[in-house]
Amino acid sequence: MGIQKFLFAVVAVIMLASRVHAVDPPPIDSHLFQSGELVYTDGFDGPLNKKWWQTRTKNWEVVDGLLIGAPDYKDVAEAQTALKRDHHLGLSPVIRLDNLPSKFVVRMRVKFEGKEFKTGRPKFDIGHHINTVTFRDNGYVVKLHGGKQFLGKAPDVKLNEWLDVALEFQEGELWIEVNGKGQLIKHEQVVLEGRSELTFKTFEDAPNRIMFDSVSLWKAN
């Protein structure tokens, strides 16, 4: 069991105990915030929680404690025949973690399948095409909507392996941490601009599944 899965199990047990014995939920673990409320946590042991997740492609399912997204079609020809168009073919799994608070902390364990990193993939958007985090060998790039970029190094950032990712957000400030190494970004372009979501995208050629092992979201004060 990975450390993120173990921590999720601890959080889930504490939350269950709090309902029975009125124990306070675990405190927020944050570089930016002193307090917050745990609003969602999931180890994917049941059906997909559609309050928090919005699938943008069709082939998403919860299997054996994992949320897994796969391509809707095996190749371009099959997709174009089925959809009768040449764009938005569903070859790259896409999903959104929705309804983010204006100030939040999210911790997750995610894996991107693939043969090699490519320009702009795999990635997730903070807001709708506003701020983008793109993974690459042993690191990532944060690109703000005005074009400003921040490079980040992190250990063991590889395809086909689990990544422990933490984000802390409030307007003007973003803490990002990958596999235990983080950085604080302060910039006026750190905004959501009305779209409170994280959107995950990957390659269009197989192997290209996206997998989530656990996620926890706090509303920060």
Predicted features and spans:
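Bacterial N-terminal signal peptides
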Residues: F8-A17
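Extracellular glycan-recognition surfaces and repeat-rich motifs
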Residues: N49-A79
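Short tryptophan-centered beta-strand motifs in secreted/extracellular beta-sheet-rich domains
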Residues: F44, V106-M108, E161-V178
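Extracellular carbohydrate-recognition regions
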Residues: V23-T57
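Flexible glycan-contacting loops in extracellular carbohydrate-active proteins
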Residues: K186-D213
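Short, aromatic/His-centered strand-loop micro-motif at the edge of beta-sheets
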Residues: L144-D164
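Secretory/extracellular carbohydrate-interaction modules
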Residues: Y73-H145
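Beta-strand-rich interaction surfaces with strong enrichment in secreted/lumenal proteins
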Residues: D29-S30, S92-D98, L151-V157, H187-E188, ...
